Amino acid sequence: MGTDYRNSGRGGRDGPGGRGPGNDRRDSGRSFGDRRPERPDFKRGDGGRGFGDRRGSGPPGGPDRGDRRGPRDGPGGRGGPGGPGGGFKGGAKTMVKPHPKYDGIFISHGRGDVLVTKSLAPGVAVYGEKRISVEGTESKIEYREWNPFRSKLGAAVRLNVLDMPIKPGAKVLYLGAASGTTVSHVSDIVGPTGAVYAVEFSQRSGRDLLEVAKARTNVYPIIADARHPYKYRMIVPEVDCIFSDVAQPDQARIVAENARYYLKANGGMLISIKASSVDSTLKPEAVFAREIETLREHDFKCKEQLDIGEFHRNHAIVVGRFRVKAA
Protein backbone atom coordinates (compact mmCIF):
# COMPACT_ATOMS: atom_id res chain seq x y z
CA MET A 1 0.00 0.00 0.00
CA GLY A 2 1.50 3.38 -1.03
CA THR A 3 2.26 6.27 1.30
CA ASP A 4 -0.55 8.79 1.75
CA TYR A 5 1.12 12.15 0.98
CA ARG A 6 -2.03 14.15 1.50
CA ASN A 7 -1.52 14.28 5.26
CA SER A 8 2.25 14.84 5.27
CA GLY A 9 4.42 17.96 4.80
CA ARG A 10 2.02 20.89 4.96
CA GLY A 11 -0.60 18.92 6.80
CA GLY A 12 -4.18 18.28 5.97
CA ARG A 13 -6.64 21.00 5.27
CA ASP A 14 -8.02 21.05 8.79
CA GLY A 15 -5.06 19.48 10.56
CA PRO A 16 -1.84 20.85 12.09
CA GLY A 17 -0.06 23.05 9.55
CA GLY A 18 -3.05 23.08 7.24
CA ARG A 19 -4.82 26.09 5.89
CA GLY A 20 -7.59 25.68 8.32
CA PRO A 21 -11.26 26.02 7.63
CA GLY A 22 -12.27 29.00 5.58
CA ASN A 23 -8.75 29.70 4.32
CA ASP A 24 -9.02 27.99 0.97
CA ARG A 25 -8.57 30.53 -1.85
CA ARG A 26 -11.44 28.89 -3.65
CA ASP A 27 -13.68 29.50 -0.67
CA SER A 28 -12.49 32.99 0.22
CA GLY A 29 -12.77 34.35 -3.32
CA ARG A 30 -9.32 35.99 -3.15
CA SER A 31 -6.96 35.83 -6.11
CA PHE A 32 -3.21 36.33 -6.29
CA GLY A 33 -3.79 40.04 -6.93
CA ASP A 34 -5.66 40.40 -3.61
CA ARG A 35 -2.91 39.36 -1.21
CA ARG A 36 -2.24 42.88 0.06
CA PRO A 37 -4.65 44.41 2.56
CA GLU A 38 -7.17 46.66 0.93
CA ARG A 39 -6.55 50.42 1.05
CA PRO A 40 -9.23 52.96 1.81
CA ASP A 41 -11.03 54.03 -1.33
CA PHE A 42 -9.58 57.52 -1.78
CA LYS A 43 -11.05 59.53 -4.58
CA ARG A 44 -8.83 61.58 -6.79
CA GLY A 45 -9.11 65.10 -5.49
CA ASP A 46 -9.74 64.33 -1.79
CA GLY A 47 -7.17 66.85 -0.70
CA GLY A 48 -5.37 69.44 -2.81
CA ARG A 49 -1.63 69.68 -3.17
CA GLY A 50 0.01 72.70 -1.60
CA PHE A 51 2.93 74.57 -3.06
CA GLY A 52 5.47 72.51 -1.17
CA ASP A 53 4.35 69.06 -2.33
CA ARG A 54 6.22 67.83 -5.35
CA ARG A 55 4.65 64.45 -5.68
CA GLY A 56 2.76 64.03 -2.44
CA SER A 57 2.89 60.95 -0.27
CA GLY A 58 -0.04 59.21 -1.88
CA PRO A 59 -3.73 59.56 -1.11
CA PRO A 60 -5.43 61.78 -0.17
CA GLY A 61 -5.05 64.03 -3.17
CA GLY A 62 -2.25 62.22 -4.97
CA PRO A 63 -2.77 60.56 -8.34
CA ASP A 64 -2.61 56.79 -8.56
CA ARG A 65 0.61 55.63 -10.16
CA GLY A 66 -1.33 53.74 -12.76
CA ASP A 67 -3.13 56.89 -13.86
CA ARG A 68 -0.11 58.99 -14.71
CA ARG A 69 -0.13 58.24 -18.37
CA GLY A 70 -2.79 57.29 -20.82
CA PRO A 71 -2.75 56.76 -24.55
CA ARG A 72 -1.27 59.71 -26.34
CA ASP A 73 -4.58 60.98 -27.67
CA GLY A 74 -6.83 59.27 -25.18
CA PRO A 75 -8.12 60.33 -21.78
CA GLY A 76 -5.24 61.34 -19.56
CA GLY A 77 -2.76 61.30 -22.43
CA ARG A 78 -0.34 64.12 -23.07
CA GLY A 79 -2.06 65.24 -26.23
CA GLY A 80 -5.64 64.36 -25.40
CA PRO A 81 -8.33 65.21 -22.90
CA GLY A 82 -7.56 64.50 -19.30
CA GLY A 83 -10.46 62.13 -18.80
CA PRO A 84 -12.60 61.81 -15.68
CA GLY A 85 -9.57 61.27 -13.45
CA GLY A 86 -7.53 64.13 -14.90
CA GLY A 87 -8.84 66.82 -12.61
CA PHE A 88 -11.07 67.59 -9.71
CA LYS A 89 -14.18 69.66 -9.44
CA GLY A 90 -14.33 72.85 -7.46
CA GLY A 91 -16.99 73.00 -4.82
CA ALA A 92 -18.09 75.12 -1.92
CA LYS A 93 -14.66 74.70 -0.29
CA THR A 94 -12.69 75.65 -3.41
CA MET A 95 -12.35 79.31 -4.34
CA VAL A 96 -10.29 80.65 -7.23
CA LYS A 97 -9.16 84.26 -7.00
CA PRO A 98 -6.91 86.41 -9.21
CA HIS A 99 -3.28 86.55 -8.13
CA PRO A 100 -2.75 89.81 -6.22
CA LYS A 101 0.44 90.58 -8.16
CA TYR A 102 0.28 89.01 -11.64
CA ASP A 103 -2.44 89.49 -14.27
CA GLY A 104 -3.71 86.30 -15.89
CA ILE A 105 -2.60 84.06 -13.01
CA PHE A 106 -4.88 82.78 -10.26
CA ILE A 107 -4.71 81.08 -6.87
CA SER A 108 -6.98 78.22 -5.88
CA HIS A 109 -7.89 78.37 -2.19
CA GLY A 110 -9.02 74.95 -1.06
CA ARG A 111 -7.08 72.23 0.66
CA GLY A 112 -3.87 74.19 0.22
CA ASP A 113 -3.24 77.23 -1.96
CA VAL A 114 -2.25 76.32 -5.51
CA LEU A 115 -1.16 78.38 -8.53
CA VAL A 116 -3.56 77.91 -11.45
CA THR A 117 -4.17 79.38 -14.89
CA LYS A 118 -7.50 79.70 -16.66
CA SER A 119 -7.53 77.01 -19.33
CA LEU A 120 -7.69 78.20 -22.92
CA ALA A 121 -8.55 74.61 -23.93
CA PRO A 122 -11.06 73.24 -21.38
CA GLY A 123 -11.12 69.48 -21.09
CA VAL A 124 -7.54 69.03 -22.27
CA ALA A 125 -4.69 68.09 -19.92
CA VAL A 126 -1.15 68.69 -21.18
CA TYR A 127 1.02 66.89 -18.64
CA GLY A 128 -1.43 65.17 -16.31
CA GLU A 129 -2.04 68.31 -14.27
CA LYS A 130 -5.07 68.63 -12.03
CA ARG A 131 -7.97 70.67 -13.33
CA ILE A 132 -10.55 72.59 -11.33
CA SER A 133 -14.03 73.29 -12.60
CA VAL A 134 -15.68 76.30 -10.98
CA GLU A 135 -19.17 77.65 -11.55
CA GLY A 136 -19.03 80.99 -13.38
CA THR A 137 -21.76 83.54 -13.96
CA GLU A 138 -22.88 81.89 -17.20
CA SER A 139 -21.03 78.57 -17.38
CA LYS A 140 -18.31 76.54 -15.72
CA ILE A 141 -14.73 77.80 -15.87
CA GLU A 142 -11.80 75.38 -15.91
CA TYR A 143 -8.47 76.16 -14.26
CA ARG A 144 -5.26 74.13 -14.51
CA GLU A 145 -2.83 73.60 -11.64
CA TRP A 146 0.62 75.06 -12.35
CA ASN A 147 3.22 72.85 -10.72
CA PRO A 148 6.40 74.85 -9.88
CA PHE A 149 8.42 71.62 -9.83
CA ARG A 150 7.56 71.05 -13.49
CA SER A 151 8.03 74.64 -14.67
CA LYS A 152 10.89 77.12 -14.11
CA LEU A 153 8.57 80.01 -14.84
CA GLY A 154 6.01 78.59 -12.42
CA ALA A 155 8.73 78.42 -9.76
CA ALA A 156 9.60 82.08 -10.39
CA VAL A 157 5.95 83.09 -9.98
CA ARG A 158 5.67 81.00 -6.83
CA LEU A 159 8.72 82.83 -5.42
CA ASN A 160 7.27 86.27 -6.29
CA VAL A 161 9.50 87.35 -9.16
CA LEU A 162 9.70 91.15 -9.27
CA ASP A 163 8.87 91.75 -12.94
CA MET A 164 6.44 89.56 -14.88
CA PRO A 165 6.15 90.83 -18.48
CA ILE A 166 4.05 87.82 -19.52
CA LYS A 167 0.47 89.03 -19.16
CA PRO A 168 -2.85 88.99 -21.04
CA GLY A 169 -2.46 90.15 -24.64
CA ALA A 170 1.35 89.87 -24.68
CA LYS A 171 3.34 88.42 -27.57
CA VAL A 172 5.97 86.05 -26.18
CA LEU A 173 8.97 84.43 -27.85
CA TYR A 174 9.65 81.21 -25.95
CA LEU A 175 13.10 79.65 -26.55
CA GLY A 176 13.48 76.01 -25.52
CA ALA A 177 9.79 75.13 -25.51
CA ALA A 178 10.42 71.37 -25.02
CA SER A 179 7.15 69.39 -24.89
CA GLY A 180 5.01 72.42 -24.14
CA THR A 181 4.41 72.10 -20.39
CA THR A 182 5.15 75.73 -19.52
CA VAL A 183 4.13 76.92 -22.98
CA SER A 184 0.59 75.76 -22.24
CA HIS A 185 0.42 77.92 -19.11
CA VAL A 186 1.89 80.92 -20.94
CA SER A 187 -0.82 80.33 -23.55
CA ASP A 188 -3.44 80.47 -20.79
CA ILE A 189 -1.97 83.70 -19.39
CA VAL A 190 -1.69 85.69 -22.62
CA GLY A 191 -5.13 84.49 -23.70
CA PRO A 192 -6.76 84.68 -27.13
CA THR A 193 -5.47 88.20 -27.80
CA GLY A 194 -1.85 87.21 -27.14
CA ALA A 195 0.54 84.83 -28.88
CA VAL A 196 3.30 82.38 -27.95
CA TYR A 197 6.00 81.71 -30.55
CA ALA A 198 7.50 78.50 -29.20
CA VAL A 199 10.93 77.50 -30.55
CA GLU A 200 12.19 73.95 -29.99
CA PHE A 201 15.12 72.20 -31.67
CA SER A 202 14.42 68.57 -30.71
CA GLN A 203 12.23 66.69 -33.19
CA ARG A 204 10.89 64.40 -30.50
CA SER A 205 9.87 67.21 -28.14
CA GLY A 206 8.63 69.12 -31.15
CA ARG A 207 6.04 66.43 -31.87
CA ASP A 208 4.63 66.85 -28.37
CA LEU A 209 4.67 70.61 -28.81
CA LEU A 210 2.64 70.27 -32.00
CA GLU A 211 0.02 68.29 -30.08
CA VAL A 212 -0.25 71.10 -27.53
CA ALA A 213 -0.65 73.67 -30.30
CA LYS A 214 -3.54 71.75 -31.88
CA ALA A 215 -5.80 72.73 -28.98
CA ARG A 216 -4.41 76.27 -28.60
CA THR A 217 -4.83 78.74 -31.42
CA ASN A 218 -2.41 81.26 -29.86
CA VAL A 219 0.58 78.86 -29.85
CA TYR A 220 2.85 78.89 -32.92
CA PRO A 221 5.27 75.93 -32.75
CA ILE A 222 8.61 76.47 -34.50
CA ILE A 223 10.95 73.49 -34.88
CA ALA A 224 14.26 75.29 -35.33
CA ASP A 225 17.61 76.07 -33.72
CA ALA A 226 17.39 79.16 -31.50
CA ARG A 227 21.04 79.89 -32.32
CA HIS A 228 19.90 81.05 -35.77
CA PRO A 229 16.97 83.41 -35.17
CA TYR A 230 16.97 84.71 -38.74
CA LYS A 231 15.60 81.33 -39.90
CA TYR A 232 12.17 82.03 -38.39
CA ARG A 233 11.99 85.74 -39.16
CA MET A 234 9.04 85.12 -41.52
CA ILE A 235 6.97 83.74 -38.62
CA VAL A 236 7.86 85.79 -35.56
CA PRO A 237 6.92 89.50 -35.36
CA GLU A 238 8.15 92.02 -32.81
CA VAL A 239 7.44 90.61 -29.35
CA ASP A 240 6.85 92.05 -25.89
CA CYS A 241 8.88 89.46 -24.01
CA ILE A 242 11.43 86.66 -24.39
CA PHE A 243 11.52 83.67 -22.07
CA SER A 244 14.48 81.32 -22.48
CA ASP A 245 15.11 77.83 -21.11
CA VAL A 246 17.58 76.38 -23.61
CA ALA A 247 20.24 75.17 -21.11
CA GLN A 248 23.23 75.81 -23.38
CA PRO A 249 26.73 77.15 -22.56
CA ASP A 250 26.10 80.21 -24.76
CA GLN A 251 22.54 80.81 -23.58
CA ALA A 252 23.02 84.53 -22.85
CA ARG A 253 24.34 85.08 -26.38
CA ILE A 254 21.40 83.15 -27.84
CA VAL A 255 18.95 85.37 -25.97
CA ALA A 256 20.80 88.50 -27.09
CA GLU A 257 20.69 87.43 -30.75
CA ASN A 258 16.96 86.74 -30.60
CA ALA A 259 16.35 90.03 -28.82
CA ARG A 260 18.20 91.91 -31.56
CA TYR A 261 15.80 90.44 -34.14
CA TYR A 262 12.49 90.41 -32.30
CA LEU A 263 12.34 92.09 -28.87
CA LYS A 264 10.92 95.59 -28.77
CA ALA A 265 12.66 98.41 -26.89
CA ASN A 266 12.00 98.13 -23.16
CA GLY A 267 10.73 94.59 -23.77
CA GLY A 268 10.89 92.05 -20.97
CA MET A 269 13.37 89.19 -20.61
CA LEU A 270 13.32 86.14 -18.35
CA ILE A 271 16.10 83.59 -18.71
CA SER A 272 16.36 80.33 -16.78
CA ILE A 273 20.02 79.51 -16.18
CA LYS A 274 21.20 76.06 -15.15
CA ALA A 275 24.71 76.55 -13.80
CA SER A 276 26.04 73.10 -14.71
CA SER A 277 24.88 73.48 -18.33
CA VAL A 278 26.90 76.68 -18.74
CA ASP A 279 30.09 75.70 -16.87
CA SER A 280 30.25 72.73 -14.52
CA THR A 281 33.73 73.71 -13.26
CA LEU A 282 32.53 76.93 -11.61
CA LYS A 283 30.31 77.54 -8.63
CA PRO A 284 26.73 78.43 -9.55
CA GLU A 285 27.12 81.98 -8.21
CA ALA A 286 30.08 82.60 -10.52
CA VAL A 287 28.19 81.23 -13.52
CA PHE A 288 25.15 83.42 -12.86
CA ALA A 289 27.34 86.53 -12.46
CA ARG A 290 29.11 85.83 -15.75
CA GLU A 291 25.85 85.35 -17.66
CA ILE A 292 24.44 88.58 -16.24
CA GLU A 293 27.55 90.43 -17.38
CA THR A 294 27.11 89.02 -20.90
CA LEU A 295 23.51 90.20 -20.97
CA ARG A 296 24.53 93.69 -19.87
CA GLU A 297 27.03 93.83 -22.71
CA HIS A 298 24.13 93.24 -25.12
CA ASP A 299 21.89 96.13 -24.01
CA PHE A 300 20.00 94.34 -21.25
CA LYS A 301 19.33 95.97 -17.91
CA CYS A 302 19.13 93.12 -15.40
CA LYS A 303 16.76 93.84 -12.53
CA GLU A 304 16.74 90.63 -10.54
CA GLN A 305 18.50 87.32 -10.06
CA LEU A 306 16.04 84.91 -8.46
CA ASP A 307 17.29 81.63 -6.99
CA ILE A 308 14.76 78.88 -7.77
CA GLY A 309 16.86 76.09 -6.24
CA GLU A 310 13.97 75.27 -3.93
CA PHE A 311 12.22 73.79 -6.96
CA HIS A 312 15.03 73.30 -9.52
CA ARG A 313 18.51 72.61 -8.21
CA ASN A 314 21.30 75.01 -9.26
CA HIS A 315 18.91 77.14 -11.29
CA ALA A 316 18.30 80.87 -11.27
CA ILE A 317 15.93 83.13 -13.16
CA VAL A 318 17.40 86.40 -14.39
CA VAL A 319 14.88 89.13 -15.13
CA GLY A 320 15.56 92.25 -17.14
CA ARG A 321 14.60 94.74 -19.83
CA PHE A 322 16.05 95.33 -23.28
CA ARG A 323 17.26 98.70 -24.56
CA VAL A 324 15.64 100.62 -21.75
CA LYS A 325 14.75 104.13 -22.85
CA ALA A 326 15.83 106.99 -20.64
CA ALA A 327 12.96 108.71 -18.86
UniProtKB/Swiss-Prot annotation:
EC number: 2.1.1.-
Gene Ontology annotations of biological process type: box C/D sno(s)RNA 3'-end processing
The record's account of how the chain is modified after translation: By homology to other fibrillarins, some or all of the N-terminal domain arginines are modified to asymmetric dimethylarginine (DMA).
Protein keywords: Methylation, Methyltransferase, Nucleus, Ribonucleoprotein, RNA-binding, rRNA processing, S-adenosyl-L-methionine, Transferase
InterPro entries registered for this protein in UniProt: Fibrillarin (IPR000692), Fibrillarin_CS (IPR020813), SAM-dependent_MTases_sf (IPR029063)
Primary residence: nucleus
Biased composition (Gly residues): 73-90
Biased composition (Basic and acidic residues): 22-56
Reactions that this protein is recorded to catalyse: L-glutaminyl-[histone H2A] + S-adenosyl-L-methionine = N(5)-methyl-L-glutaminyl-[histone H2A] + S-adenosyl-L-homocysteine + H(+)
Record localization: Nucleus, Nucleolus
Sequence positions that bind S-adenosyl-L-methionine: 181-182, 200-201, 225-226, 245-248
One GO MF term: RNA binding
Region of interest (Disordered), residue spans: 1-96
Pfam families, sorted: Fibrillarin (PF01269)
Complex formation: Component of box C/D small nucleolar ribonucleoprotein (snoRNP) particles. It is associated with the U3, U8 and U13 small nuclear RNAs.
Function noted in UniProt: S-adenosyl-L-methionine-dependent methyltransferase that has the ability to methylate both RNAs and proteins. Involved in pre-rRNA processing. Utilizes the methyl donor S-adenosyl-L-methionine to catalyze the site-specific 2'-hydroxyl methylation of ribose moieties in pre-ribosomal RNA. Site specificity is provided by a guide RNA that base pairs with the substrate. Methylation occurs at a characteristic distance from the sequence involved in base pairing with the guide RNA.
The family this protein is said to belong to: Belongs to the methyltransferase superfamily. Fibrillarin family.
Protein name: rRNA 2'-O-methyltransferase fibrillarin
Organism: Giardia intestinalis (Giardia lamblia)
